[in-house]
Amino acid sequence: MKNVFSTQNIEKTKRFSAWQEALCEHYLKVDSRSQNPTDYEGFLNKSILGPVILSEVFLSTQDIFRNHHHIALLDKDCFYIMFPSKGSLLVEQAGKQQVSTPGAAVLFDAAMPYHLQCRN
């Protein structure tokens, strides 16, 4: 996999903003919030295999939101399958909640609003 983004060499006060831009560039238009944006760390590695994109992501605790405004831009129409290697991921979509922890995957639709709670 090729590293396409890292906060490592970015000034601490600018890391979270840069991370949000990277999410929008490499995934989907979203909003995100961090409890500690001045001490944010993350990286994104990516491989493209035909129509499938595989990525490895390390991210600090945060909440990610995709709403109707983002979807109206329809930058991508796809599904995401996430397999956390540590921590947990809570996905809220269509009135349902799914929790993913190491060893358990979660699937969600990018064409519908969602809220992801990413916890280390």
Model-predicted regions and their roles:
Residues Y40-N120:
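N-terminal regulatory/effector-sensing and dimerization cores
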Residues M1-I53:
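A short, N-terminal "cap"/entry segment at the start of jelly-roll beta-barrel domains
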